[in-house]
Amino acid sequence: MAGGGGAGSKVSVAAVQFACTDVESENVDTAERLIREAHKKGANIVLVQELFEGQYFCQAQRLDFFQRAKPYKGNPTIIRFQKLAKELEVVIPVSFFEEANNAHYNSVAIIDADGTDLGLYRKSHIPDGPGYQEKFYFNPGDTGFKAFKTKYATIGVGICWDQWFPECARAMVLQGAEILFYPTAIGSEPQDNNLDSREHWKRVMQGHAGANLVPLVASNRIGRETVETEHGESTITFFGNSFIAGPTGEIVKLANDKDEDVLVAEFDLDEIKSTRHGWGIFRDRRPDLYKVLLTLDGEKS
């Protein structure tokens, strides 16, 4: 398959979405069931949503929630999905809350189709706002943006808030990523019931797909989750809308905001590569003019 050195260039990708309980074993079982369903539908690479082992605890700043973090090495969920990936011959990016000595990260382990752990990506952009208080729990990632060569394709994986930054997508594609994946946890805004970001959310990522001429897969959770905070209860209704976009940004598969789902789409990566080269987007780049992107204030210092 493309990117992995094998024959052929057609790759099937999947996004799954489901409602999370606060019982880890139930969520991991659900993820496995849906991965198996995606495999039956022909998927080679299957994306599960962000932090799927439990409910989205970042609604609150609570010390007890640090107990949910686990080390990368020896992580039982990663080991379980390594076995599953090998059995089904599918690639699985596994999202988890990582403890690394005194640091904590929002991380994804990339599991290849033979069960090999290809490495780790740690979320780079950490949000901090009502209902999404991730800076309390997570250090900014230190891995940098990566492209992982799997059996079926070279892939790039960003995590949730990363998806709002075009620099993240471009950096992964520049390193050879043929498909972009974004595990996500996004829904209503506790401070403003009238704010609905789902269409904006989709359009931003559709832009990444179109600007880089690569397919893109986003997996989001569904369901209403209430967490006890230091100020009372906080509730988010996660809006699902997991989707798969084609290389011009067109949505080819879309889930709704309420139902568990498994989306699968096939892409010919050789054909997409030829189109990408033909457009000249990467030929005509001017990195010498982009130094301003390395600043916070736009000054050319």
Swiss-Prot record:
Q: Name a single GO biological process.
A: putrescine biosynthetic process from arginine
Q: Which SUPFAM superfamilies match?
A: Carbon-nitrogen hydrolase (SSF56317)
Kindly give the InterPro entries that the UniProt entry links to this protein: Aliph_Amidase/BUP, C-N_Hydrolase, C-N_Hydrolase_sf, N-carbamoylputrescine_amidase
Q: What is its EC number?
A: 3.5.1.53
User: In the UniProt entry, which residues are flagged as the active site?
Assistant: 50 (proton acceptor), 123 (proton donor), 160 (nucleophile)
The pathway is:
Amine and polyamine biosynthesis; putrescine biosynthesis via agmatine pathway; putrescine from N-carbamoylputrescine (amidase route): step 1/1
User: What quaternary arrangement does the UniProt entry report?
Assistant: Homooctamer.
Instruction: Describe the function of this protein.
Output: Involved in polyamine biosynthesis.
User: What protein family does this chain belong to?
Assistant: Belongs to the carbon-nitrogen hydrolase superfamily.
Which protein, by its recorded name, is this? Answer: N-carbamoylputrescine amidase
Q: Gene that codes for this? A: CPA
